[in-house]
Amino acid sequence: MAEGIDRKMDDRMEFTTSADVTVAPTFQDMHLKENLLRGIYAYGYESPSAVQSRAIVQICKGRDTIAQAQSGTGKTATFSISMLQVIDTAVRETQALVLSPTRELATQIQSVVMALGDYMNVQCHACIGGTNVGEDIRKLDYGQHIVSGTPGRVADMIRRRNLRTRHIKMLVLDEADELLNRGFREQIYDVYRYLPPATQVVVVSATLPYDVLDMTTKFMTDPVRILVKRDELTLEGLKQYFIAVEKEEWKFDTLCDLYDTLTITQAVIFCNTRRKVDWLTDKMREANFTVSSMHGEMPQKERDSIMQDFRQGNSRVLISTDVWARGIDVQQVSLVINYDLPVNRENYIHRIGRSGRFGRKGVAINFVTSEDVRILRDIELYYSTQIDEMPMNVADLLT
């Protein structure tokens, strides 16, 4: 179900956009299929967000597109609506492919596509690592209009010839900065080599560093650009604070002191390593605090079950690595704690964008040791923002 997109954020966005991009003020103005419009309204959208009103028409025209907008502004629906518009459901072949950096994000995209395409009889499969290969093969052999997946498993299914590529007309790279970072770069190229030469490429992300934009020239043709200025990228409406903890060992006591505040709604605590997540989870539980945890090396079934519990509000505090930072939408999260500041400053916006989704109040708290001060200053400079020391009444900011 779509919640209201933050229109205040829309109004403050400055789009550095290709000159020929027009704005479609309503979904009707986009000339979408009738059954797709029904799905959009049933999902809870009334009018398009800033990025949707600019990007959907361009993507539906078949243009290669680079779309950048902040977390919580409807980016997933932007490309989901576009894919649903261009596929032909009478042809039971894969026609659109979305690649995401995490399994959770790939699964979430599948559920958004299925919800928006509810009246279209669309088939969409999440093709992700850590799941049964036989099930993937069965689903793909049955025929899927859209596949949302992680690069490794998708490349594997293409090589096995279970994912047939000859009808693919659109490739979407979601959270493209993370995908194109070293880890996935080769796998992306691997997938791209198997696609028809005329495949349209859509690149979507909250952050697009210059080297990523530069790299897209290798597989995009005259792309239309829909961009927010980088210095506009700090997340409006989110309050950001730091707590000076001086030494690493003092962080744990500080977190325990904050626990009552954390459980006002729901909170996510980020650590930089899997080992740290496990250590902190054990330590919190030993001190009789209720927490759940998730990282990339857990079996997929366990990750799914933890995510479901957290989405339903059964668990209120989740400790995680950056696997959770990208695009996972849980409406009730109002507080993010960076137990460790992110190693990659571009992940900062993805982490704190988990709180205050769609214009709700959100607070981000950064634990800063004396060694972290330089990293914090670097983040402030990069996002042209100011992060103040946390006030005593932080609980009041969440209610």
Swiss-Prot record:
Q: What is its main location?
A: nucleus
**Residues in coiled coil:** none
The residues listed in the UniProt record as binding ATP, with positions renumbered to this chain, are: 69-76
Q: What SUPFAM superfamilies is this protein classified in?
A: P-loop containing nucleoside triphosphate hydrolases (SSF52540)
Q: Name one GO biological process term.
A: rRNA processing
- Sequence motif Q motif, residues: 25-53
Compartments where found: Nucleus, Nucleolus
Annotated ranges, domain Helicase ATP-binding? 56-226
Extract the InterPro entries matched here: DEAD/DEAH_box_helicase_dom, Helicase_ATP-bd, Helicase_C-like, P-loop_NTPase, RNA-helicase_DEAD-box_CS, RNA_helicase_DEAD_Q_motif
Catalytic activity of the protein: ATP + H2O = ADP + phosphate + H(+)
UniProt EC number? 3.6.4.13
Q: What are the residue boundaries of the Helicase C-terminal domain, all occurrences included? A: 237-398
Residues forming the motif DEAD box are 174-177
**For this UniProt entry, what's an example GO CC term?**
catalytic step 2 spliceosome
Function as written in the Swiss-Prot or TrEMBL entry: ATP-dependent RNA helicase involved in 40S ribosomal subunit biogenesis. Required for the processing and cleavage of 35S pre-rRNA at sites A0, A1, and A2, leading to mature 18S rRNA.
Q: What is this protein called?
A: ATP-dependent RNA helicase fal1
Q: Which organism is it from?
A: Sclerotinia sclerotiorum (strain ATCC 18683 / 1980 / Ss-1) (White mold)
> Which taxonomic lineage does the organism of this UniProt entry have?
Eukaryota, Fungi, Dikarya, Ascomycota, Pezizomycotina
Q: Which gene encodes it?
A: fal1
